[in-house]
């Protein structure tokens, strides 16, 4: 395999656990780089109800949301998450929303041969925007996954999978598909 396009979590939660064990492991042979094209698909949301009438509870909610989203100090959630210290030392280092946090964090992974993954992820954040999002994205992604799954399981050939995908998108969403 030459490489994969994917979200930051692909490294820790998909590739690494499936890289083999012992002498058959490819751990340490992997690296990551900034993409030549951007990728963005939503994100994680944190919401709070606007009708909290108890001032003390409202302040706690405010402080919690600030800690999760905006606190870039070493005591903030994103810093602890990025550095693998959320539940004490030795946790999984992970990409976080804050480029500020990643820029000052240690993203070195043994799986990546000691590479600091944040050196690739921080510049890649410039590509993350929602300008290409549409109301059709989830439906199109589902149709694509279904077509690829049929092809991967040998149920259809490549051309049929592509044609089925186009038909599904056109029929389901009423879109013109070339």
Language-model features: where?
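Extracytoplasmic/periplasmic substrate-binding proteins
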Residues: 1-63
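Sec/Tat-exported extracytoplasmic proteins
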Residues: 8, 14-18, 68-72, 148, ...
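Solvent-exposed, acidic/flexible segments
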Residues: 37-38, 54-61, 133-141, 154-158, ...
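Non-transmembrane alpha-helical segments in soluble domains
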Residues: 49, 61-73, 77-79, 145-152, ...
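Charged/polar, low-hydrophobicity segments characteristic of intrinsically disordered regions
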Residues: 78-81, 174-178
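Long, aromatic- and glycine/proline-rich binding clefts that accommodate carbohydrate-like moieties
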Residues: 79-146, 150
